[in-house]
């Protein structure tokens, strides 16, 4: 996708960029009712997730992460914007008359044909088990548990790589750099997720963040002592501690958050932090 640059006509467009989008008519049976941004508050109105609130109303698009229409060819009819994710989505018309949304693979265009199954070609947009893929294949929408649907490598520009197959397991390198084992019976989609340059987009104005449901982030050092451990002092005072902390007093940098005996630990060959 092309990134369009705004001319500096007004402060709101200063250094702003816009991703070129393809808009089209939406499938009514694939869209569920109002889907509001998370406000970050519980039933009592207490903030449980900071920096969230507001945002434009959204309609939820039902995405087919399972790709369980086996051996039925489908054609890409539209490439659409989805407000619920960074990646674009594309509408598929199958030969049996059914319509579904899938994540838009990079390089796929309107009119391309896709299919899922066990004996299909290695082509962008096709979905098949890892047993049928050659080593070095770039994939996305990867299952962790067979039949549960794709859970890994679904963000815009995400791509995983199949690097080895041995026994009942396949070794994959994930977008985070983590190398882990996954059952060879799990399915994945060939190719990379589209909308690769989304991380280079500049919103250009604070209001654009509010449309996305994101509230301002305030530094703890400018707060009062009652609000943050870093707060207080006269003028630009230091935080007054040896190490930075969260608003609740826990270490902010370097604290491990993953459980040591998590069930999936035995499947990880190399952690994403150890590269």
UniProtKB/Swiss-Prot annotation:
Does the record carry Ribosomal protein as a key word? yes
* Annotated signal peptide: none
Q: Where is this region: Disordered?
A: 225-249
| Keywords of the record | Plastid, Ribonucleoprotein, Ribosomal protein
InterPro entries attached here? NA-bd_OB-fold, Rib_uL2_dom2, Ribosomal_uL2, Ribosomal_uL2_bac/org-type, Ribosomal_uL2_C, Ribosomal_uL2_CS, Ribosomal_uL2_dom3, Ribosomal_uL2_RNA-bd_dom
Family matches, as SUPFAM superfamilies: Nucleic acid-binding proteins, Translation proteins SH3-like domain
Q: Does the keyword Magnesium apply?
A: no
**Gene Ontology CC terms, in alphabetical order:** mitochondrial large ribosomal subunit; plastid
Gene Ontology MF term list? RNA binding; structural constituent of ribosome; transferase activity
Domain of life, source organism? Eukaryota
What quaternary arrangement does the UniProt entry report? Part of the 50S ribosomal subunit.
How is this protein named in the record? Large ribosomal subunit protein uL2c
Q: What is the lineage of its organism?
A: Eukaryota, Viridiplantae, Streptophyta, Embryophyta, Tracheophyta
Q: Which gene encodes it?
A: rpl2
């Amino acid at each position: 996708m092309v990134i369009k640059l705004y001319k500096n006509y007004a402060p709101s467009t200063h250094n702003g960029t816009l991703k070129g989008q393809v808009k089209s008519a939406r499938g009514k049976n694939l869209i569920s009712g109002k889907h509001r941004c998370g406000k970050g508050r519980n039933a009592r109105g207490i903030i449980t997730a900071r920096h969230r609130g507001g945002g434009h109303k959204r309609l939820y698009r039902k995405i087919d992460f399972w790709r369980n229409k086996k051996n039925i060819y489908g054609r890409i009819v539209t490439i659409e914007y989805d407000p619920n994710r960074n990646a674009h989505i594309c509408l598929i018309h199958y030969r049996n008359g059914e319509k579904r949304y899938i994540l838009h693979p990079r390089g796929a265009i309107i009119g391309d044909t896709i299919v899922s199954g066990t004996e299909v070609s290695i082509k962008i947009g096709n979905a098949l088990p890892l047993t049928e893929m050659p080593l070095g294949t770039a994939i996305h929408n990867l299952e962790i548990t067979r039949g549960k649907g794709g859970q890994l490598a679904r963000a815009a520009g995400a791509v995983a790589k199949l690097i080895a197959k041995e026994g009942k397991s396949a070794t994959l390198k994930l977008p985070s750099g983590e190398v882990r084992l996954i059952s060879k019976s799990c399915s994945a989609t060939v190719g990379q997720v589209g909308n690769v340059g989304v991380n280079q987009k500049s919103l250009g104005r604070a209001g654009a963040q509010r449309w996305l449901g994101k509230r301002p982030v305030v530094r703890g050092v400018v707060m009062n002592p009652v609000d943050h451990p870093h707060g207080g002092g006269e003028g630009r005072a230091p935080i007054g501690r040896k190490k930075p902390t969260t608003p609740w007093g826990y270490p902010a940098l370097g604290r491990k958050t993953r459980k040591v005996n998590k069930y999936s630990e035995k499947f990880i060959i190399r952690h994403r932090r150890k590269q």
